[in-house]
Amino acid sequence: MLKTRQCLLGVRTFHGVTSRIWSFFLYILRKHIRTIIQYQTVRYDILSLSPISRNRLNNVKRKILVLDLDETLIHSHHDGVLRPTVRPGTPPDFILKVVIDKHPVRFFVHKRPHVDFFLEVVSQWYELVVFTASMEIYGSAVADKLDNNKAILKRRYYRQHCTLDSGSYIKDLSVVHDDLSSVVILDNSPGAYRSHPDNAIPIKSWFSDPSDTALLNLLPMLDALRFPADVRSVLSRNLHQHRLW
């Protein structure tokens, strides 16, 4: 009887150890699969400007690209979420620990595919500005991680800079710059930029799809938007797209 119990205990211990090893293996595999997918996708080649294009850029103002965070560049969920939108077992890119209302909260943050490459490229074309409806203590920490000491996300606006209207946070781009002809906002929420639809580029909300290429797909358009004197002359033709998201 004693030997039988010892045998059962040994089997259970072996099963427990095997299960933990398998879970760790899946964790590492999923993390590396995301990296492999990003580097296998075709990148956007940055070509040298012709003399004519360079002269054109010298005759227009440098544009400002305003970037939303949640569901545009990243997705996060925090402790206590019963049904997170991320597939269980998917490792976060980083974890933030912040104190909200005197309570410590952990946020598990997932970066949208290609966001690092996207920021590296567009920072060469635009002055980048973060504008999020999130609280500053959270938004600032996320922006720090995305910036990664490159000093490309220095200007930041948070919930206190938004206007609350019927329960929605509206982003007033005039706080970013008084000349809206040179301001572009990239945001997954049309309600956030409803005061400035002619300055907006819509993007689908992202939660967990590892094959998403939305940020890469926007690079040709953002490349071209550097050249017109007024970005609204181009983006106003795209208003029908805002209803899709």
UniProtKB/Swiss-Prot annotation:
<keyword id="KW-0904">Protein phosphatase</keyword>
<dbReference type="GO" id="GO:0005737">
    <property type="term" value="C:cytoplasm"/>
</dbReference>
<dbReference type="GO" id="GO:0010867">
    <property type="term" value="P:positive regulation of triglyceride biosynthetic process"/>
</dbReference>
<dbReference type="GO" id="GO:0071595">
    <property type="term" value="C:Nem1-Spo7 phosphatase complex"/>
</dbReference>
<dbReference type="GO" id="GO:0005635">
    <property type="term" value="C:nuclear envelope"/>
</dbReference>
<dbReference type="Pfam" id="PF03031">
    <property type="entry name" value="NIF"/>
</dbReference>
<protein>
    <recommendedName>
        <fullName>CTD nuclear envelope phosphatase 1B</fullName>
        <ecNumber>3.1.3.16</ecNumber>
    </recommendedName>
</protein>
<dbReference type="InterPro" id="IPR050365">
    <property type="entry name" value="TIM50"/>
</dbReference>
<dbReference type="GO" id="GO:0031965">
    <property type="term" value="C:nuclear membrane"/>
</dbReference>
<dbReference type="InterPro" id="IPR036412">
    <property type="entry name" value="HAD-like_sf"/>
</dbReference>
<feature type="transmembrane region" description="Helical">
    <location>
        <begin position="7"/>
        <end position="29"/>
    </location>
</feature>
<comment type="function">
    <text>Serine/threonine protein phosphatase that may dephosphorylate and activate lipins. Lipins are phosphatidate phosphatases that catalyze the conversion of phosphatidic acid to diacylglycerol and control the metabolism of fatty acids at different levels. May indirectly modulate the lipid composition of nuclear and/or endoplasmic reticulum membranes and be required for proper nuclear membrane morphology and/or dynamics. May also indirectly regulate the production of lipid droplets and triacylglycerol. May antagonize BMP signaling.</text>
</comment>
<dbReference type="InterPro" id="IPR023214">
    <property type="entry name" value="HAD_sf"/>
</dbReference>
<keyword id="KW-1133">Transmembrane helix</keyword>
<dbReference type="GO" id="GO:0004721">
    <property type="term" value="F:phosphoprotein phosphatase activity"/>
</dbReference>
<dbReference type="InterPro" id="IPR011948">
    <property type="entry name" value="Dullard_phosphatase"/>
</dbReference>
<dbReference type="GO" id="GO:0060322">
    <property type="term" value="P:head development"/>
</dbReference>
<keyword id="KW-0812">Transmembrane</keyword>
<keyword id="KW-0472">Membrane</keyword>
<dbReference type="GO" id="GO:0006998">
    <property type="term" value="P:nuclear envelope organization"/>
</dbReference>
<feature type="domain" description="FCP1 homology">
    <location>
        <begin position="58"/>
        <end position="225"/>
    </location>
</feature>
<keyword id="KW-0256">Endoplasmic reticulum</keyword>
<comment type="similarity">
    <text>Belongs to the dullard family.</text>
</comment>
<dbReference type="GO" id="GO:0004722">
    <property type="term" value="F:protein serine/threonine phosphatase activity"/>
</dbReference>
<dbReference type="GO" id="GO:0005789">
    <property type="term" value="C:endoplasmic reticulum membrane"/>
</dbReference>
<keyword id="KW-0539">Nucleus</keyword>
<keyword id="KW-0378">Hydrolase</keyword>
<dbReference type="InterPro" id="IPR004274">
    <property type="entry name" value="FCP1_dom"/>
</dbReference>
